[in-house]
Amino acid sequence: MNILVVKTPEELAEAGYKLIKEVVKSKENPTLGMATGSSPLGIYAEMRKNKLDTSHATTVNLDEYVNLPHEDKNSYHYFMQEQLFDHLPFKQTYVPNGMASDLEEECKRYEGILVANPVDLQILGIGENGHIGFNEPGTPFNSPTNIVELTESTRQANLRFFENEEDVPTHAITMGIGSIMKAKQILLVAMGSKKAEAIKELLQGEYSEACPATVLQRHPNVTVIADPEALSLCSEAIADEHRQVFTISDLLSDSRVGETAN
């Protein structure tokens, strides 16, 4: 697992963008797994600013709220249109349909899309409790795309995007952990002390469904981009090894900088 330590959101955005650009430019028909929320915003801004040619790329999104119309400003359909799809051309884009009349069938349909479009690079954030996508603690590591009931902590974390607490959706469709693990490469981004406990579990915690992110310990190609605050609860050995700023060029040149032993 490669750890890239950055000092600012701008450095995180630039590093994440360069990793995405490398995948997009090196693949004939790349598939990008897209995340939403605040974590990837800077990366998407870099993609827009640099007018990255994504005309040959397909995107698949991690998740979507249930019963939130696509035109609602808090839906992930709307988010992706605002952040990327209205600005850059893509070969094809896919977001789960949380308005589907048969949600179980929608999960099967979306899992089929993932099988037909193997993900080259999956972008992830990480929840304070270690969730990835909307896969909460206790989710089986082999889970496919599924419907989840959002925990109170996740709903509270997302409350800032809504006017009232009752407006925050209670359910979502999410790629399962098993689906996420099929990606050829994973980029996880985290900033701030609120993510410190989750990052500690990811890097040195027990491999356990109690912390969904620990599944990444078994993935062969993961890059974590984090700031010192997000790494602040890691052991001294981890801190000594990673508390310096490496460049994304090191990662792109197959350097073993910041590689953790699992």
Curated annotation (Swiss-Prot):
Share an example GO biological-process annotation for this protein.
Answer: glucosamine catabolic process
Specify the pathway.
Answer: Amino-sugar metabolism; N-acetylneuraminate degradation; D-fructose 6-phosphate from N-acetylneuraminate: step 5/5
- Single annotated GO MF: glucosamine-6-phosphate deaminase activity
State the InterPro entries in the record. Glc/Gal-6P_isomerase, Glucosamine6P_isomerase, Glucosamine6P_isomerase_CS, NagB/RpiA_transferase-like
What reaction does this enzyme carry out catalytically?
alpha-D-glucosamine 6-phosphate + H2O = beta-D-fructose 6-phosphate + NH4(+)
Q: Name one Pfam family in it.
A: Glucosamine_iso
Q: Which residues form the active site?
A: D63, N129, H131, E136
On the tree of life, the source organism's domain of life is Bacteria
From the record, give the cysteines joined by S-S bonds: none
CDD domains named in the record: GlcN6P_deaminase
SUPFAM superfamilies for the chain: NagB/RpiA/CoA transferase-like
Keywords annotated in UniProt: Carbohydrate metabolism, Hydrolase
Supply the EC number(s): 3.5.99.6
Recorded GO cellular component terms are:
cytoplasm
Role: Catalyzes the reversible isomerization-deamination of glucosamine 6-phosphate (GlcN6P) to form fructose 6-phosphate (Fru6P) and ammonium ion.
Family (UniProt): Belongs to the glucosamine/galactosamine-6-phosphate isomerase family. NagB subfamily.
List, alphabetically, the HAMAP family matched.
GlcN6P_deamin
Q: What is this protein called?
A: Glucosamine-6-phosphate deaminase
